[in-house]
Amino acid sequence: MKLPKEGDFITIQSYKHDGSLHRTWRDTMVLKTTENAVIGVNDHTLVTESDGRRWVTREPAIVYFHKKFWFNIIAMIRDNGVSYYCNLASPYIMDQEALKYIDYDLDVKVFADGEKKLLDVDEYELHKQKMGYSSDIDYILKENVKILVDWINNGKGPFSQSYINIWYKRYLELKNR
C-alpha cells in the first residue's frame, strides 16, 4: 500500500470491536505520513454516523494516528484555545479504501484550560461484556490511558502548542495554494 502524500485527501473509518462500522470522516487532508504515523486535518469535514446521520466538523482539527499506540488524538483549534478529544483505539491500518481503526469507547477530553476528563467508562464496561474484549485488550487500553495522560501532562507531540502551530500553519499553506 502506497502511503498518501502531503495534501492528499483520505477517508477515515472507525469500527467497533465486533467489526461494525462506527463513524466515517470524508476528505481528511494529509499533512504528513511516516512509516508509523499519520498527521492530518479535518476542517468542515463530512462525518457519517453508523445510523446514517451526517454532520460537518465545526472548526479545524489536527488529527494524529499512530501504529504503535492504542489511541488517536484530535486537537480542535478554537477561538478560546486548543481542546483535545482522544479516542482509546487500536493502532490504525491503512488500505486502498481508508485509514481504519477500532474505537474502544474510552475517551479523554482535554479542555482549553488544561482540565482533563475520562469519558464513557460505562459504555466501555458495557461493550467490554457485550463484545467480549479480552483481558489483554483491557490491560493494553488501561496502560495506554496512562501513556496518553503522561503525554498530556508533559506537552508531548500533539499536546505541544508548537506542534499545533507548525501543523496548522502547514495546513493553511496547503489550503491556500
Swiss-Prot record:
It comes from the Bacteria. Gene3D superfamilies: FomD-like (2.40.380.10). Mg(2+) 2 binds at D105, D107, D120, E123. It is an enzyme of class 3 (hydrolase). It catalyses: a ribonucleoside 5'-triphosphate + H2O = a ribonucleoside 5'-diphosphate + phosphate + H(+); a ribonucleoside 5'-diphosphate + H2O = a ribonucleoside 5'-phosphate + phosphate + H(+). InterPro entries: DUF402 (IPR007295), FomD-like_sf (IPR035930), Ntdp-like (IPR050212), SA1684 (IPR016882). Its EC number is 3.6.1.15, 3.6.1.6. Its cofactor is Mg(2+). Disulfide bonds: none annotated. The keyword Lipid metabolism does not apply. Keywords: Hydrolase, Magnesium, Metal-binding. Pfam families: DUF402. GO terms for molecular function: magnesium ion binding; nucleoside diphosphate phosphatase activity; ribonucleoside triphosphate phosphatase activity. SUPFAM superfamilies: FomD-like (SSF159234). The active site is at R23 (proton donor). Mg(2+) 1 binds at N87, D103, D107. Belongs to the Ntdp family. Has nucleoside phosphatase activity towards nucleoside triphosphates and nucleoside diphosphates. NCBIfam families: PRK13662.1. This is Nucleoside triphosphate/diphosphate phosphatase. It comes from Streptococcus mutans serotype c (strain ATCC 700610 / UA159).
